[in-house]
Structures are given as structure tokens and as C-alpha cells.
Amino acid sequence: MIQQAIAKVLEGEDLTRAEAASVMTEIADGGATPAQSGAFLAALRMKGETVDEIAGAADVMRQRADRVRVDRDVFIDTCGTGGDGRHTFNISTTAAFVAAGAGVCVAKHGNRAVSSRSGSADVLAALGVNVDADKETVERCIEEVGIGFLFAVRLHPAFKAIAGVRRELGVRTIFNLLGPLANPAGARHQVLGVYEARWVPVLGGVLAALGAAHAFVVHGEGLDEIAVTGMTHVCEVRDGQVERYTIRPEDLGLPRRDAAELVGGDAAANARIVTDVLEGQAGGPRDAVLANAAAALVCAGAAKDLRDGVARAARSIDSGAAREKLRQLVAATTVPA
């Protein structure tokens, strides 16, 4: 199948959802050579990935994931694509703790760094979380603490083989978009940041096709986050309906911030910023977290709108609830000596 798919894509023709799924299955099963996999990914990138192609690939990633059981009707993910190249601190990871502190169940999917020096797994490890905890521990964390970390590299074993091909290609491919679409717990409520604004409507269409209950796809001022530095492009998906709009910090009751305030560093430096935010320190990092946590609360049904979400997120931080969720997650994932 992959040879025919390469030929079709090189002619500029789009694949159907089923065809894309067949190719991804072949890659996952080891039926495609590294050369074929690389050619397919590069050809698809040159043509431009469509909603159906991304949805078909995501179908297979979801099917092949090592499933994490969550016994809740509503739980969220705040996983973005990464790769925006702006080297901010880990905003969406911090927002996950704030959402959890506000009473929302979180199954946080993430990985090591893509373009920054600190991905969600890196900063969580620096904060003391055992990101390599086994699946049973992760499930227990979600159930008892209300937040758990789903480490992508451990829970998507079928796609380990493609990592080398992606590394050798050295360019973004469909896999850069797939991670946030393949939460191993099957989260249907999520905030998904994308590294370029052009992907906002595309990923919105994909989430609608995949059956998202309530989700936000966002890109703000070059970031795969809701921006407090300027305008954010939003695609809100709700039970198959897709709405596009833009928001500014002022719409959320937040001041406009300078991008330099949000720049992070390595995992240790970012862990200090996360800690400062969770301890209530005012400033740009806090406001960025409030904006993104607000969207998480809205998609979970825990806030009526983004302004209300900001207020509830602020209470989660200022009451100490968000910080306590981090402490509990560290304790729950740490193996006793």
C-alpha cells in the first residue's frame, strides 16, 4: 500500500482517511522500509496534509496506543504540538496543574523536548515527577490525585521505529501533529496548541472528525498556546460543530504582556518558573498560565466562559490547590526508598 500511496501523493492527490490509515498500519507493523517511510512522510509534507489524512493516521495511533484506563466521564488533555521555536517555559503543563487544582481530571499527554530545551516530560522530571512510572501507577494517579502524566514514548510502542526516520529527515512531518491527537486515555476534551496558525482550522476539522466532545485548537503570536502577548487564533470544536474566532488578552480580563517575559530555559530553569507560578508569583508567566488553564476549564465544563475560567484558575493557584496537585503527583509517582 505504501508504494501506491507515495506515487499518489507525489502526483498531488490526497489520500482518503482509510488509505492514510492503511499506510500508517503498514509503518506500525514494520511492513514499510525506512526509505519508504521517509519518502511517504516527505511527499505528504510537500503536498500538505489534509483533514482526512491526519484523521486516518490518528485513528491508527489511537488504536495502537497502550491504553490508559480513566474511569471518568470528563477528563482533559493540554498537549500541544510543540515545535514553535519560541523557547517559552512549559505553559500548558503548568496549566494542567491549575486545571486539576480547580477540580478537573487531567490525563496530560506529553513527551521530551521538540524545539525547546524542555518538553513536558523534561520539566516534570525536574519537578520531581517520575515520568517513567508504569501504566498502573499513572492510572492510579489520575483516579486518586486527579492528574497523571502519559509519557508518549512509553505508550506508543508501535511507532518507536519511525523515530529514527523522523530524526534523519530533520523536518516537520505529520507526526508533529499526531501526538496531541492520540492521547492514550482517549481524552475527548482538550486544549491543543499548534506551531503555525494555518493548522488551527485543519486540526479543528480533524478533532471534529475524531469525535471530540469539546476542544480548543489555538495558536497565538507564534506560540502553540493562547497568547497574552497579542492575538490568538482559535478553532472551538463542540460535538461536531466547529467555530473559528480570535481572542486577545483583554477579552479575558488580562493585561497584554511582552514575549520576553515568557521565555524559559532548560528543564531546571523552567521548573523554577512553574514553581513560582504555582506559588502565586504575579507576572507574565502567571497570566499565560491563567489564559490557557481557562480554556481547559471551559472545555471540561468547569467554567462558563474564558473570563470565568481565568477567575477560577486564579483561585486554583491562590488557594494553593494547584501547587498541592503537583506535590501529590510527585508523591504518588515516587518509589519509596
Curated annotation (Swiss-Prot):
GO cellular component, one term: cytosol
Residue positions binding anthranilate 2: R166
Coiled-coil ranges per UniProt: none
Transmembrane in keyword set: no
Cofactor: record remark: Binds 2 magnesium ions per monomer.
EC assignment: 2.4.2.18
Disulphide-bonded residues: none
Keyword terms: Amino-acid biosynthesis, Aromatic amino acid biosynthesis, Glycosyltransferase, Magnesium, Metal-binding, Transferase, Tryptophan biosynthesis
Pathway: Amino-acid biosynthesis; L-tryptophan biosynthesis; L-tryptophan from chorismate: step 2/5
Binding site for Mg(2+) 2: D224, E225
Similarity-based family: Belongs to the anthranilate phosphoribosyltransferase family.
Known role: Catalyzes the transfer of the phosphoribosyl group of 5-phosphorylribose-1-pyrophosphate (PRPP) to anthranilate to yield N-(5'-phosphoribosyl)-anthranilate (PRA).
Self-association state and partner proteins as the record states: Homodimer.
Full protein name: Anthranilate phosphoribosyltransferase
Record lineage: Bacteria, Pseudomonadati, Myxococcota, Myxococcia, Myxococcales
Gene: trpD
